[in-house]
Amino acid sequence: SLLGPSGCGKTTLLRILAGFEYPSKGTVSIDGSDVTDIPANLRPTNMVFQNYAIFPHINVKRNIEFGLRKEKISSEEMNQRVNDALKMVKLEGYESRFSNQLSGGQRQRIALARALVKRPKVLLLDEPLGALDKKLREEMQIELRNLQRSVGITFVFVTHDQEEAMTMSDRVAVMNQGKILQVSPPKELYDFPVNLFVGDFIGDINLLNSEISNIDGKNVKVLINGIGEYTIQAHTIINQNDTIVTGIRPKSINISSNDNKKSDIQVKGKITNTSFYGNLTYVYVSIEGVDKALMLSTAESLQGLSINSDCYLNINLKDIRVIKKNDP
């Protein structure tokens, strides 16, 4: 997936891959072949848009076979490929229907079938689920993932929804201001962000102002505001002159009503707010010397703790990330 805020260049990059835009420098290669100067209609790619672009005046069958009509194939092969495409998207028997007789999810699947029927090497998807409601979007995420696995071709999926990207992707490219900042599997992206933008953009994270005291290989001694000075193992290259923050994911902070729990770091705080989200409770805790309340998530009982209660936060050093403010 290509993931990033609106205007960061995701769709422009997709259009360059498709051949609708020409790169200002560099080349475009697909399956080892340079396609930079090959026009869009001759590239081994197909594109699915957010608005589906289903023709309302022709039925499903003719919509799907539209791209095949300029190819020199027999009507028997065309019918077979249309039937195969409908089977892929689980819409057999819908050949004679028109777009106004289809639900939003069905129209999206017809758009996918029309793209897949030409058997591209790369399928380009430009926020294709953006117009669907939450429940249908989640169902289509699973269907798209299963479809990609069954057809075995590369899907390049553009989205600004981090949850969507993390759910569906083998690899995620995080973009900002026209740059790709990090390309990693979802878990690696979440656990080991390369800079402040990636760490803050992917999921919830507590960011604490910090300064580098000393560096010994991958071991970085940092002074964390309101917490103390600790040696943390860095997962990216950190230099003495880098400006940093330290990051802690909410799931990595444990809360207790007393100081009996063992952890590398224990700090005292006061609960300022709680929010209930299904199976998780988010707890906000203010700590002396820290500008912003720390957020933690827990599936366990708060053990009698409530707003304005004093509490203890327990953190292990392995769960703290040293994050550069500047680009990697």
Model-derived features with residue positions:
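Conserved ABC transporter NBD signature motif
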Residues: 26-34
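ATP-binding Walker
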Residues: 8
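ABC ATPase nucleotide-binding domains
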Residues: 38-50, 54-197
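The feature captures the beta-strand-to-loop junction immediately N-terminal to the Walker
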Residues: 3-5
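Non-catalytic connector elements of ABC transporters
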Residues: 205, 215-328
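Helix-to-loop junction immediately C-terminal to a conserved catalytic motif
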Residues: 18
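ABC ATPase nucleotide-binding domain helices that frame the ATP-binding cleft
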Residues: 11-14, 110
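A position-specific signal in ABC ATPase nucleotide-binding domains
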Residues: 21-22, 29, 69
